[in-house]
Amino acid sequence: MTLWINGDWVTGQGALRVKRNPVSGEVLWQGNDADAAQVGQACRAARAAFPRWARLSFGDRQVRVERFAGLLESNKAELTAIIARETGKPRWEAATEVTAMINKIAISIKAYHVRTGEQRSEMPDGAASLRHRPHGVLAVFGPYNFPGHLPNGHIVPALLAGNTIIFKPSELTPWSGDAVMRLWQQAGLPPGVLNLVQGGRETGQALSALEDLDGLLFTGSANTGYQLHRQLSGQPEKILALEMGGNNPLIIDEVADIDAAVHLTIQSAFVTAGQRCTCARRLFLKSGTQGDAFLARLVAVSQRLTPGTWDDEPQPFIGGLISEQAAQQVVTAWQELEAMGGRTLLAPRLLQAGTSLLTPGIIEMTGVTGLPDEEVFGPLLRVWRYDNFDEAIRMANNTRFGLSCGLVSPEREKFDQLLLEARAGIVNWNKPLTGAASTAPFGGIGASGNHRPSAWYAADYCAWPMASLESDSLTLPATLNPGLDFSDEVVR
């Protein structure tokens, strides 16, 4: 039984789904998808549970959420292994994901009070109050690259605000979704408050098509995000929060420490096997001998990156991609870029047929035109050379996406210029593009999405503001507006 609906584990009535380790092929999880009828049941359960959950005090909801945080801590090793085995990422990185899940809970609690709590200001004849109310029933779509951490960034603030939820993990990470749901079960959530439906496209379409949804919170690809936006167009009564991908630029200016700059670039482009939405996809490198030296060093160090299994010792920097198909898509993208005129500096290689272990690739695209503006979700870095900083910014902004952007430079003035001109929601200076702070917004503009699903800013879209003018008594004003007559004289 792999679906959690209204406080019970039930068997899906849809197609059988089998999840394998993307490197070893070992079967990790299997179960049936939720069909449309079961998705509807989950929605009705969430709707029935909403009034009581929303009427609980914030403190009562907080108790359950903090209990979940404690369960994450006590089950950290087990959940780390599940995420690592299912995604292919090394154990060390999966452990940081679980830690991030834990840390964001305390931040989400604080964010609720600071950003969406209650405020009151006194007026001469009463008071003006601001309160926040939950939307109702929300659907949460989770991605596969961080199957615990990223859905957690929606679920925790949504529950704290008083919403009830239908959670659909990525069809590529059902085991992680299952494991997290069982911890929520132990945390003592009332039936119907959080429901789990497993499945792929058909389940997702049934979920997003529900008329009784009050909103949808999504993290994933731009293509799917666009489909959801079209599907919910003309429905302003539903909140839609989209965090999508990026075709992210990293600009390398003059650098004193080449190895430090290479390290930052590798962290930006190849961590998580290039499967972070903030990963650098486009590298802009200043022309000249220093740029040549940097590029040669980047290729040399990247060539030493050997993907390994989740439990290899010593631990590898990167593991496998989410699937062999995903790895092959990166190879195909590289081949297409080469055919368009790109100059390969480091060819990506599948280490073994039938696995998702893929080495990083680097290809120079200077002077090549007509390139597609698409995110290649994997360890493939494209390189352009530029002559001046204004040109670098123009090239960096030449994308429909706007998630992250970075600059490596000793000059604060250039960073200030980038801050003014960059089209990105995250702009870093001498820091990896993949770094983020839970107290800062996480998200972008354009094809990268709309709202900001971080622990701090997610509170904004999980509740709506209610303004009130209040007085504990009613009296006739001493001064009336023109034309009003409350005298005792009888008008004839």
UniProtKB/Swiss-Prot annotation:
Statement: the UniProt record of this protein carries the keyword ATP-binding: no
Annotated residues that bind NAD(+) are located at G220, S221, A222, N223, T224, G225
Q: Which domain of life is it from?
A: Bacteria
Q: Which Gene3D superfamilies match?
A: Aldehyde Dehydrogenase, Chain A, domain 1, Aldehyde Dehydrogenase, Chain A, domain 2
User: What Pfam families does this protein's entry cite?
Assistant: Aldedh
Q: Which reaction does it catalyse?
A: N-succinyl-L-glutamate 5-semialdehyde + NAD(+) + H2O = N-succinyl-L-glutamate + NADH + 2 H(+)
Q: What GO MF annotations does this protein's record show?
A: aldehyde dehydrogenase [NAD(P)+] activity; succinylglutamate-semialdehyde dehydrogenase activity
The record's keywords, sorted A to Z, are: Arginine metabolism, NAD, Oxidoreductase
Would you tell me the protein name for this molecule? N-succinylglutamate 5-semialdehyde dehydrogenase
The top of its lineage is:
Bacteria, Pseudomonadati, Pseudomonadota, Gammaproteobacteria, Enterobacterales
